[in-house]
């Protein structure tokens, strides 16, 4: 197990300590969330946690939860979620996020907005001083609108590329049947709140991967003296 996987594993296990029996949980997507879901299944099997119900944020997390016998309920059937646990591609000091590297950010944001608490689990490589200086911002767009949206983003001084699939010909297609534009702004995103609103107001855009003022707590995995540890940084601002 390499050091990054060790960091992800320790923080995934630490996240389960935040879970109580009888909770409705938002089950995140991505590599760290996968480890968290597996740790959750272990806790349920051992009897440590009981009467847990999950709300999946993607087809990935839905399939994994079903394989591990974690009971699932549909997002539309719940009025609130006790706790959502998810990963992130970038986390800034104010706990603003970029998500969507796995093209799941639309459902992830729906679950996060319905959660009483959003817990983000990452390894320390995901902590940044400013968003979008290296990781592109995912923007989900209607298939027949991607070029038009790309032109508007260009007018906003953003460079966008249509995300292409790696194991099939053509672009990545989301769970909603849409496409993804990956956007980089010159010197990153200086005003995440404004950019989130501006992009979402472009006709043809379904949702972008900026998660603004949604995160309550961040757990970070790191290697300290050759030992993986998890810690919770303080929010700045």
UniProtKB/Swiss-Prot annotation:
GO terms for biological process: D-ribose metabolic process; pentose-phosphate shunt, non-oxidative branch. Substrate binds at residues 29-32, 86-89, 99-102, 126. Its EC number is 5.3.1.6. It comes from the Bacteria. Pathway: Carbohydrate degradation; pentose phosphate pathway; D-ribose 5-phosphate from D-ribulose 5-phosphate (non-oxidative stage): step 1/1. GO terms for molecular function: ribose-5-phosphate isomerase activity. Belongs to the ribose 5-phosphate isomerase family. Homodimer. This is Ribose-5-phosphate isomerase A. It comes from Prochlorococcus marinus (strain MIT 9312). The lineage of its organism: Bacteria, Bacillati, Cyanobacteriota, Cyanophyceae, Synechococcales.
């Amino acid at each position: 197990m390499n050091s990054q996987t060790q960091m992800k594993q320790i923080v995934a296990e630490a996240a389960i300590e935040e879970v109580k029996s009888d909770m409705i949980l938002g089950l995140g997507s991505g590599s760290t969330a996968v480890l968290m879901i597996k740790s959750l299944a272990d806790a349920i099997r051992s009897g440590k946690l009981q009467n847990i119900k999950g709300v999946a944020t993607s087809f990935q997390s839905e399939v994994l939860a079903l394989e591990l016998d974690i009971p699932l309920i549909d997002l539309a059937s719940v009025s609130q979620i006790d706790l959502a646990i998810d990963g992130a591609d970038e986390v800034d000091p104010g706990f603003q996020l970029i998500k969507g590297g796995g093209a799941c950010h639309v459902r992830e944001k729906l679950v996060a907005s319905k959660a009483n608490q959003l817990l983000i689990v990452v390894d320390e490589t995901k902590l940044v001083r400013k968003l979008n200086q290296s990781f592109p911002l995912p923007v989900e767009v209607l298939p027949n609108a991607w070029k038009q949206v790309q032109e508007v983003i260009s007018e906003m001084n953003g460079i966008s590329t249509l995300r292409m699939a790696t194991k099939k010909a053509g672009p990545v297609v989301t769970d909603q049947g849409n496409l993804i534009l990956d956007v980089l702004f010159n010197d990153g995103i200086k005003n995440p709140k404004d950019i989130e609103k501006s992009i979402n107001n472009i006709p043809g855009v379904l949702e972008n991967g900026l998660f603004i003022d949604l995160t309550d707590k961040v757990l970070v995995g790191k290697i300290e003296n050759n030992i993986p540890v998890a810690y919770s940084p303080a929010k700045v601002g």
